[in-house]
């Protein structure tokens, strides 16, 4: 009963804050002006405020689910898209898109970001599987080092080809540039999260170890890399639109596990 009440309170709080956020910005918008049909404020509401809210919700949900998947599959509570080099790999993909396809659309940048994020996450997990000593701190430490190497490569390429300013928008997450027509790729989070829920039981089994999974007839490597691909695509779609949003995938799953 207590858990149900806390869930209701949190849901109502989210709804209330979401509604309030729609009327916060440089230009004042009031519910009365929307109801009375103020065209200018209605246009701002539909082009900027509503897309911003939807992007924020998709980002929070997506990064949390991606972090939970990675923690479950890696059997480590400190692994996330941030400490697993997924975000760094996605940023590298965006830079490559800017270098090789300067006129690329949002979809083109997202495609590059998907590929590099998936490959970077796969390499990270493959590498930690080869590490003999898998202490709780060792795995995320390896991920942070690997991510810093990728970030170093990204920074070097950006500096060499004078793309530092162009890349800066994706180095720090922000929602100020979220507008209608420039954020819709983040909607990929919704089907990917739904797909993650479908595979949730398989992820739990794989998280118990390779031998346990094989005894239950679950294809360990297939489920492992399917989960990592889902987490990487969620992260890449968010990074492409709003930039690097760090540590949500690390903090939120651990907070939920503390109270559930």
Each PLM stretch: what is its role?
Residues 1-260:
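Alpha-helical transmembrane segments in inner-membrane proteins
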């Amino acid at each position: 009963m207590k858990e149900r009440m806390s869930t209701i309170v949190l849901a109502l709080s989210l709804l209330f804050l979401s509604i309030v956020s729609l009327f916060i910005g440089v230009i004042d918008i009031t519910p009365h002006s929307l109801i009375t049909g103020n065209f200018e404020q209605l246009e701002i509401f539909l082009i900027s405020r509503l897309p911003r809210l939807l992007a924020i919700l998709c980002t929070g949900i997506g990064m949390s689910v991606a972090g939970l998947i990675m923690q479950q599959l890696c059997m480590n509570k400190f692994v996330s898209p941030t400490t697993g080099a997924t975000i760094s790999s996605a940023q590298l993909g965006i830079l490559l898109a800017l270098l090789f396809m300067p006129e690329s659309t949002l979809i083109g940048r997202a495609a590059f970001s998907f590929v590099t994020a998936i490959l970077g996450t796969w390499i990270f997990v493959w590498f930690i599987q080869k590490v003999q000593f898998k202490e709780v701190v060792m795995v995320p430490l390896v991920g942070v080092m690997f991510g810093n190497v990728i970030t170093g490569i990204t920074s070097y390429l950006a500096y060499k080809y004078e793309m530092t300013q162009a890349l800066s928008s994706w180095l720090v997450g922000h929602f100020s540039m979220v507008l209608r027509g420039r954020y819709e790729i983040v909607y990929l989070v919704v089907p990917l999260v739904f797909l993650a829920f479908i595979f949730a039981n398989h992820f739990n089994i794989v998280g118990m170890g390779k031998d346990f999974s094989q005894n239950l007839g679950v294809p360990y490597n297939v489920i492992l890399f399917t989960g990592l691909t889902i987490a990487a695509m969620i992260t890449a779609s968010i990074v492409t639109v709003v930039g690097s949003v760090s540590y949500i995938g690390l903090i939120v799953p651990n907070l939920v596990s503390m109270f559930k």
